[in-house]
Amino acid sequence: MIHAGNQKITNKEQSPRVGELRGELRRKMAAHTPNAGAHATAIPGLTLYHRTAPSPCYPAMFEPSLNVFVQGRKRITFAGMTYLCDQSTFLLSSIDVPVVSQIIAASEDVPLLSLLLKLDMAVVREILSQEEFHAPDGSSPARGIAIGKTTVDLLQPFCRLLDLLDASEDIPFLSNLIQREIVYRLLRGPQGERLRAIATLGDQSHRTAKAIAWLRANYTKPLRVEELAEIARMGMSTLHHHFRALTAMSPLQYQKQLRLVAARERMLVEGIDAASAAFEVGYESASQFNREQALLRSTADAGHQSASARRLRNGQRLTTLQIVLSRWTRKLSRNASANGLPGSLHRLKAKQLKPGRRSLTS
């Protein structure tokens, strides 16, 4: 096992077959994304993304979905946490999550390629009813977004799903089967508990998800937390606790981010100005919209700077460790020479920790 952050990477994730499957996905996507942009497909819930340039930070909304990255790099900021996504990762969203997104590595020659598959929670519940999974204990609700390592078991059904784009007559029957397999693999994987908790009727996370869904549908209305607690059938303090555990923000903060995303979409799609978009999504003034948009950008920048600072601190700790080890081995070597001990101690220098050989969490 290789440790990467808090995740264990298995042999399946490191096997040459993973690289072969990524290559297959790149070739299949190239055939179905002739130009840059988001490409909806004939398969319900599946969208292919092809981006050819880095982007500034922008607010976005993730629905319950699985986003598999095939090439390029993207940075997702969620409540001050930064998730770096590349060809070895997938991003799982188990609820509606407002994020700040930024493409950080993409070009004409090496575009960012990713597949987004929306998750049908009814299908998740159906699979849970047919198979035995460890029930979520509900003691520590997980965040509504998580990053994981792509495996052979996950990439294979995606390859077969893209094959259906060349056999449209098979899509109505086979696409449902393949999507069920993908959901099954997710439920069996390290991030499966997130989906199980959201989908389990009566679970606190499931009740909180109902409140989140209501907010998503009614974000333009004034927020009454008492009404939200009634919808979730929870006490107000309990709702606040579980809401923050899933989204890392309060219901009011969540509503603000929903409005920011909706306003941006109106400006891009409908071509309206910022003031009109702000009023349409529930802001009382354009200045309020501008303030919150600036705050969102600064929060995303702070999250990125915090992650960079952690990497710098880790590098500084590694340098200090190298100095200590170097001094220690020189001392041992001198003692060995003075006492006529075997020359093997002199070879300790060759075993000093070298830059780049580390497994520190960045």
Language model: regions and residue ranges:
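Basic/polar phosphate-binding segments, predominantly the helix-turn-helix DNA-binding elements
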Residues: E181, R185-Q191, I198-Q204, R216-N218, ...
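Amphipathic alpha-helical segments enriched in hydrophobic/aromatic residues interleaved with Lys/Arg
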Residues: G5-L25, V124-E181, R185-L186, E193, ...
